[in-house]
Amino acid sequence: MRDARDVLKRPVISEKSVGLIEENKYSFWVDTAANKIEIKNAVEKMFKVKVVDVRTINVDGKKKRVGKHVGRTADRKKAIVTLKAGDRIEGFAGL
């Protein structure tokens, strides 16, 4: 089993993700190889909450140019985690 800090990279801070907090849904950037069970276990272990649902989205990297050179940013994976009613993650409270 991988460490929870290897699975969860950082929270997603955007207008949409902050709006989802009211519905008890929290968004995280996660490791691209992580599956839903690993994400659920990592959130429950790190934040001491009960996870009801995990949804994942694979986000393709964007094409970038510097002069005549074309490259891409890295592909990422986002997870939207729904918590049991009444549970909260305190780090997101001020958003």
Curated annotation (Swiss-Prot):
GO MF annotation: an example: structural constituent of ribosome
Keyword tags: Ribonucleoprotein, Ribosomal protein, RNA-binding, rRNA-binding
InterPro entries the record matches: Nucleotide-bd_a/b_plait_sf, Ribosomal_uL23-like, Ribosomal_uL23/eL15/eS24_sf, Ribosomal_uL23_CS
Function comment: One of the early assembly proteins it binds 23S rRNA. One of the proteins that surrounds the polypeptide exit tunnel on the outside of the ribosome. Forms the main docking site for trigger factor binding to the ribosome.
NCBIfam families: PRK05738.1-3, PRK05738.2-4, PRK05738.3-2
Species the sequence originates in: Desulfitobacterium hafniense (strain DSM 10664 / DCB-2)
Pfam families the record matches: Ribosomal_L23
GO CC terms: ribonucleoprotein complex; ribosome
Ribonucleoprotein listed as a keyword: yes
Source species, domain of life: Bacteria
GO biological process: translation
Similarity section: Belongs to the universal ribosomal protein uL23 family.
Oligomer and partners: Part of the 50S ribosomal subunit. Contacts protein L29, and trigger factor when it is bound to the ribosome.
Protein name: Large ribosomal subunit protein uL23
